[in-house]
A protein has these predicted regions:
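Conserved beta-strand in the GNAT
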Residues: 58, 64-73, 89, 94
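Conserved acetyl-CoA pyrophosphate-binding loop and the N-cap/start of the following alpha-helix
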Residues: 99, 103-111
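A short beta-loop-alpha structural element at the N-terminal edge
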Residues: 5-19
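Conserved GNAT acetyl-CoA-binding A-motif
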Residues: 109, 116-128
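Conserved beta-strand-loop-alpha-helix junction that forms the acyl-donor binding cleft
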Residues: 124-134, 149-153
Length: 154
């Protein structure tokens, strides 16, 4: 194993990032190895990554992409507890199975937390898997009972 290199993605990384994200979505959602994106999903993902309203970090071992993590920015009306209205949602934190338990996800999230602070973000939310909860707690994230969600698709 080489030294792991971390960097923010560019538009040129879209193809490799989508490939790793597909691997993650198959694993997290229990999809078969044959599952592929549909055209609309690819279009919307490309539009999202090119919008500039997110920061994605990737981790590489030489030429091999081994992990990714994204921070999606949201701007809401300012509140007393969040006077800038700048918030973010952490998502798609993923490290390939043979690279887990080496601190790669933690490092990617730390980079994104620093990026968020630099952009004036006052709150980061996330949806955690059972496997990810200890990682997020170690970084200072806390469970919240104050969030409610309405699914407009269902």
């Amino acid at each position: 194993m080489n030294k792991i290199i971390y960097r923010k993605t560019t538009k040129a990384d879209m193809k490799i990032l989508m490939k790793l994200r597909l691997e993650m979505l198959r694993e997290v959602n229990g999809l078969s190895g044959e599952y592929e994106y549909d055209e609309n999903f690819i279009f919307e993902s490309r539009r999202y990554f090119e919008s500039g309203e997110q920061t994605t970090v990737i981790a590489s071992d030489g030429e091999t992409l081994v992990g990714c993590a994204s921070l999606s920015y949201t701007w809401i009306m300012p509140t007393f507890s969040h006077p800038t209205g700048n918030r973010a949602h952490l998502m798609n934190v993923y490290t390939r199975a043979d690279y887990r338990r080496r601190g790669i996800s933690k490092k990617m999230v730390e980079i994104l937390i620093g990026e968020a602070k630099g952009n004036g973000v006052t709150e980061i939310s996330l949806d955690a898997t059972e496997m990810g909860i200890p990682l997020y707690e170690s970084l200072g994230f806390k469970a919240s009972d104050s969030c409610m969600v309405m699914d407009l698709e269902g």
